[in-house]
């Protein structure tokens, strides 16, 4: 069985939290358990799940991505009958499916196709969550990493958004000051650092792997890509090596940084007067040179759940209904055709043009079930390079060797 590698600290934290998720005797009779990553759109969908079926109790637990991934892995690898409903990204679901942890949804999809207007999800969206011809995840969002920048500061300085990494580096240097960083970097392992490295490796290099899953991120182009990341990181906010999406979103909201890469699902929060000091001052464009991460996420049914699968499907389908996603349209890129083509929604959400442009030029992460497992040590080696602890070439070569050894041990390169 392929299992995600968990650090000692993560194992301890996850084990302490496990009783709430694994359920056991403490589980309330009939209560449906859902575990999820957390950001504004997913908080909205969690509320929709809690109220989806009158008289049915849904306990939702939301947390940062890496912690959710650890806890889901512990529960599923032990074949616990909770959680029942599980968050999945377009990248992470591959691991769960390969391990036999998700229930295929095809029969339920066909059964409820008309009631929930499921044909409104285009084939291109469903394909993101299909493995060996079977669908495993109900799509809830499309997402793309955009380039966030302070349009007020750019305007005052007579600058325009960068079109290349060289321009990005030079602008970050010019805006950097004790008051605010020229750049906002999110390099906390694993997920956040993967997001940023993915952009550099694909825009400046040839990606992570060749067609046979041999690492290529340590070739000459890959080394140059991380050298550029290292240069730009000189102008990042304090604590960037421990910053994930939440911390970077706050850095923009609190006027700590000028520009950088971030998810479209974080755009609306820039204009939240209750949390943001820079309302109306952020704008967005497609990332310089394209190839930043794009994808989506949604919810699946555990293969080990003892709850009625029809009930579980109705809960996730209700949360992903046309009406539900319309209500969250300011927090995401809608995965339904009817909403993507809705001109009223496009006009009401000023980040849509940049989000759609970013999605069009984006690149998904590799469809490798073990991607996040190898990503754990790849991103930590990248941090060693960016912080100057290790030379870039040496760090990437070490990561490539570790990746090769891991994948060879999991049946690759036969």
Predicted features, each with a name:
Residues 51-120, 152, 156-163, 251, ...:
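Extracytoplasmic "Venus flytrap"/periplasmic binding protein-like
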């Amino acid at each position: 069985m392929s299992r995600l590698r968990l650090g000692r600290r993560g194992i301890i934290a996850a084990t302490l939290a496990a009783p709430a998720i694994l359920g056991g005797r403490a589980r309330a009779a009939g209560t449906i358990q859902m575990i999820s990553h957390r950001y504004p759109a997913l908080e909205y969908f969690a509320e929709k799940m809690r109220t989806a079926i009158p008289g049915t109790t849904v306990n939702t637990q939301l947390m940062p991505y890496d912690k959710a991934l650890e806890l889901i892995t512990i529960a599923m690898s032990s074949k616990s009958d909770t959680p029942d409903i599980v968050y999945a990204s377009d990248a992470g679901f591959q691991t769960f499916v390969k391990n036999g942890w998700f229930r295929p949804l095809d029969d339920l999809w066909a059964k409820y196709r008309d009631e929930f207007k499921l044909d409104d999800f285009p084939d291109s969206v469903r394909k993101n969550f299909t493995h060996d011809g079977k669908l495993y995840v109900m799509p809830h969002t499309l997402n793309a990493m955009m380039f966030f920048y302070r349009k007020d500061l750019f305007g005052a300085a007579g600058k325009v958004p960068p079109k290349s990494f060289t321009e990005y580096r030079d602008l970050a240097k010019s805006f950097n000051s004790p008051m605010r960083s020229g750049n906002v970097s999110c390099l906390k392992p694993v997920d956040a650092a993967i997001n940023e490295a993915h952009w550099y490796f694909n825009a400046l290099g040839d990606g992570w792997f060749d067609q046979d899953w041999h690492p290529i991120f340590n070739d000459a182009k890959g080394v140059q890509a991380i050298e550029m990341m290292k240069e730009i990181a000189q102008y990042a906010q304090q604590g960037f090596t421990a910053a994930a999406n939440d911390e970077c979103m706050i850095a923009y909201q609190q006027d700590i940084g000028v520009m950088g890469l971030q998810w479209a699902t974080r755009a609306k929060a820039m204009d939240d007067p209750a949390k943001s000091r820079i309302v109306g001052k952020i704008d967005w464009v497609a990332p310089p040179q394209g190839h930043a991460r794009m994808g989506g996420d949604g919810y699946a049914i555990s293969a080990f759940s003892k709850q009625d699968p029809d009930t579980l499907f109705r809960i996730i389908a209700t949360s992903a209904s046309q009406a539900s996603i319309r209500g969250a349209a300011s927090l995401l890129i809608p995965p339904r055709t009817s909403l993507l083509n809705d001109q009223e929604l496009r006009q009401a959400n000023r980040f849509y043009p940049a989000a759609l442009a970013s999605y069009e030029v984006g690149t998904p992460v590799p469809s490798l079930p073990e991607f996040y497992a190898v990503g754990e040590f790849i991103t930590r080696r990248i941090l060693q390079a960016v912080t100057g602890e290790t030379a870039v070439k040496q760090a990437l070569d070490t990561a490539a060797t570790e990746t090769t050894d891991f994948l060879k041990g999991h049946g690759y390169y036969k």
